[in-house]
């Protein structure tokens, strides 16, 4: 019995050792033999076990060195695997880049490759990047699984449309930076400059408003004339081109020379049909320039029609929209009363505008009247003149009218009289200094002062007066003529010398001056508008009696 038990234990031990040899370690991939499906016994293990058998007290230093040796061998194997994998990766990508570079050379060769004579060449190409192309490139760069065919197609579609580099296109431009054409910017700045000049110089204060409006309308009309002519010419040219395109099939028919059969056929067609000759229309289109289809009279008629009807068209359109919006919220029964009220309002407005025409005329100021020519050697009464303080400025000249009566003179009448005297004397002096002695160019308000200063003093007497005909230079003016002698009775008033006969000064006697002063003092104030010899003579200080505050 004991022997049988001992035998069983021995068999179990032997079977355990045999099973230990057949056991596969899942972590030991280096000693696993895939062909036999068993584990290989490494020499290091046998050596270690032998050494353990020989010397079980092996030091830890030997075990550490053995571990480092195994680590080095594993690192070497890993490097070899990565190198092999890299070679396989490059072997697959090289053909793709080879074809890509070959395509670039083919496209550039069509334009010309650089050589010893040409030197460097600069090309431009377009790049089209699709979503599929982007995904393939990202897979390739990230080291993921990629397909050489898909990447090759993606790279082939990127570069297209090769051409030479245009250096002018890449230059800096104003439109690229600011998004506006420089011509438009210049025009806007020019308009702003004109507005600033008008505001700074106050030009509108020197030109009457209706004069400005008239000039603007005239300039607009002339500008629109050229504008409409160009528009009509463009329309005629476009219509001419369309007709030429329609006559394209007749090029061969009308261009070739007609034989006798064609002449017979054309005679038959013109005799039995009412159709126009197509070749006539064809040659008219070829020979007549569209510019002759737009005469200036047509442009003038269109411009005038547009100038008149276009504003009325917009006014009517706005009025219609206004009435439509007004009647939309009003009941149908009230439409008629509302229209009547609107008509009455328009008539009232027109009536008020007509009544206020004289007010507008007073604000704007009438046109300056032409100066009246003076009649030589004729005595004429002095017309009382008036300086108008609120007359136009700039283009408008100072307006002189009849003298204001005593009831019309305001608190500033004396100031206006003084200003009138200064301006009138300055005007007369300037005219005589420039040598302008022609009576036709003098205005009516220039002569009385000259007569008052320069005509000889005539004293009524029973004897004919003796005038000093010796020319005397006064204020740098040489007398040009001698006054005409006249024998008058004592009851008659002496005629003042006018025109060119009064340009020379005549010396009078002291008695004559005293007589004139007495006669002036004896004059009544009621004769303000009647000329008298005493009033025709300048006062003691050379002032015009018309401009005196006393009237």
UniProtKB/Swiss-Prot annotation:
Organism: Homo sapiens
Region (Disordered): 363-415, 447-551
Activity modulation comment: Inhibited by ER lumenal Ca(2+).
Function: Anion-selective channel with Ca(2+)-dependent and voltage-independent gating. Permeable to small monovalent anions with selectivity for bromide > chloride > nitrate > fluoride. Operates in the endoplasmic reticulum (ER) membrane where it mediates chloride efflux to compensate for the loss of positive charges from the ER lumen upon Ca(2+) release. Contributes to the maintenance of ER Ca(2+) pools and activation of unfolded protein response to prevent accumulation of misfolded proteins in the ER lumen.
Result of altering residue 175 to R: Decreases the affinity for Ca(2+)
Protein name listed in UniProt: Chloride channel CLIC-like protein 1
Compositionally biased tracts (Basic and acidic residues): 380-389
GO term, biological process aspect, one: endoplasmic reticulum calcium ion homeostasis
Lumenal compartment residues: 19-184, 238-329
Membrane topology, as annotated: Multi-pass membrane protein
Alphabetical list of InterPro entries matching this protein: Chloride_chnl_CLIC-like
UniProt modified residues of type Phosphothreonine: 482
Cytoplasmic side: 206-216, 351-551
The keyword Heme appears for this protein: no
Keywords: Chloride, Chloride channel, Endoplasmic reticulum, Ion channel, Ion transport, Membrane, Phosphoprotein, Retinitis pigmentosa, Signal, Transmembrane, Transmembrane helix, Transport
Transmembrane segments: 185-205, 217-237, 330-350
Subunit description: Homomultimers. Interacts with mitochondrial protein PIGBOS1 (via C-terminus); the interaction occurs at the mitochondria-associated endoplasmic reticulum (ER) membrane, a zone of contact between the ER and mitochondrial membranes, but does not appear to play a role in ER-mitochondria tethering and is not affected by ER stress. Interacts with CALR.
Effect of residue 181 to R: Impairs Ca(2+) binding relieving Ca(2+)-dependent inhibition of channel activity
Reported effect, residue 176 to R: Decreases the affinity for Ca(2+)
UniProt disease link: Retinitis pigmentosa 32: A form of retinitis pigmentosa, a retinal dystrophy belonging to the group of pigmentary retinopathies. Retinitis pigmentosa is characterized by retinal pigment deposits visible on fundus examination and primary loss of rod photoreceptor cells followed by secondary loss of cone photoreceptors. Patients typically have night vision blindness and loss of midperipheral visual field. RP32 inheritance is autosomal recessive.
Effect after changing residue 153 to R: Does not affect Ca(2+) binding
Gene: CLCC1
One of the record's GO cellular component terms: chloride channel complex
């Amino acid at each position: 019995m004991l022997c049988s038990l001992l035998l069983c234990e021995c068999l179990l031990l032997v079977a355990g050792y045999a099973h230990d040899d057949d056991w596969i370690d899942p972590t030991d991939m280096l000693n696993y033999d895939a062909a036999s499906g068993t584990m290989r016994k490494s020499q290091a293990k046998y050596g270690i076990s032998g050494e353990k058998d020989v010397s079980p007290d092996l030091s830890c230093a030997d075990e550490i060195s053995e571990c480092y040796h195994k680590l080095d061998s594993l690192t070497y194997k890993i490097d070899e695997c990565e190198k092999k994998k890299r070679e396989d990766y490059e072997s697959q990508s090289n053909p793709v880049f080879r074809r890509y570079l070959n395509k670039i050379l083919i496209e550039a060769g069509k334009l010309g490759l650089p050589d010893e004579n040409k030197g460097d060449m600069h090309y431009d190409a377009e790049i089209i990047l699709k979503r599929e192309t982007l995904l393939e490139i990202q897979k390739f760069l990230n080291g993921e699984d990629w397909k050489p065919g898909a990447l090759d197609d993606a790279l082939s579609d990127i570069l297209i449309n090769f051409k030479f580099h245009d250096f002018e296109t890449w230059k800096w431009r104003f439109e690229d930076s600011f998004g506006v054409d420089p011509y438009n910017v210049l025009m806007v700045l020019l308009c702003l400059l004109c507005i600033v000049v008008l505001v700074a110089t106050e030009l509108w204060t020197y030109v009457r408003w209706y004069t400005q409006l008239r000039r603007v309308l005239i300039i607009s009309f002339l500008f629109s004339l050229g504008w409409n002519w160009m528009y009509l010419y463009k329309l005629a040219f476009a219509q001419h081109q369309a007709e030429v395109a329609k006559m394209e099939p007749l090029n061969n028919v009308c261009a070739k020379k007609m034989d006798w059969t064609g002449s017979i056929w054309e005679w038959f067609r013109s005799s039995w049909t009412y159709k126009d000759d197509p070749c006539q229309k064809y040659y008219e289109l070829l020979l007549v320039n569209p510019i002759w289809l737009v005469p200036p009279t047509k442009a003038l008629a269109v411009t005038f029609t547009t100038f008149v009807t276009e504003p009325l068209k917009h006014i009517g359109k706005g009025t219609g929209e206004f009435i439509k919006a007004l009647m939309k919220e009003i009941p149908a029964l009230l439409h008629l009363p509302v229209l009547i009220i609107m008509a009455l309002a328009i008539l009232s407005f027109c009536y008020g505008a007509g009544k206020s025409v004289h007010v507008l005329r007073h604000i704007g100021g009438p046109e300056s009247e032409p100066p009246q020519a003076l009649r030589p050697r004729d005595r004429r009464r002095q017309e009382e003149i008036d300086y108008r303080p609120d007359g136009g400025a700039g283009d408008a000249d100072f307006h002189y009218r009849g003298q204001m009566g005593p009831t019309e003179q305001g608190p500033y009448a004396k100031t206006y009289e003084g200003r009138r005297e200064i301006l009138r004397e300055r005007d007369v002096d300037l005219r005589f200094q420039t040598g302008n002695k022609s009576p036709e160019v003098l205005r009516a308000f220039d002569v009385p002062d000259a007569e008052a200063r320069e005509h000889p003093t005539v004293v009524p007497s029973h004897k004919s007066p003796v005038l000093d005909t010796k020319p005397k230079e006064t204020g740098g003016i040489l007398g040009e003529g001698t006054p005409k002698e006249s024998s008058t009775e004592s009851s008659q008033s002496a005629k003042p010398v006018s025109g060119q006969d009064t340009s020379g000064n005549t010396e009078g006697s002291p008695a004559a001056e005293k007589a004139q002063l007495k006669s002036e003092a004896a004059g009544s104030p009621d004769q303000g508008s009647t000329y008298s010899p005493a009033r025709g003579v300048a006062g003691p200080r050379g002032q015009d009696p018309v401009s005196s505050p006393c009237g």
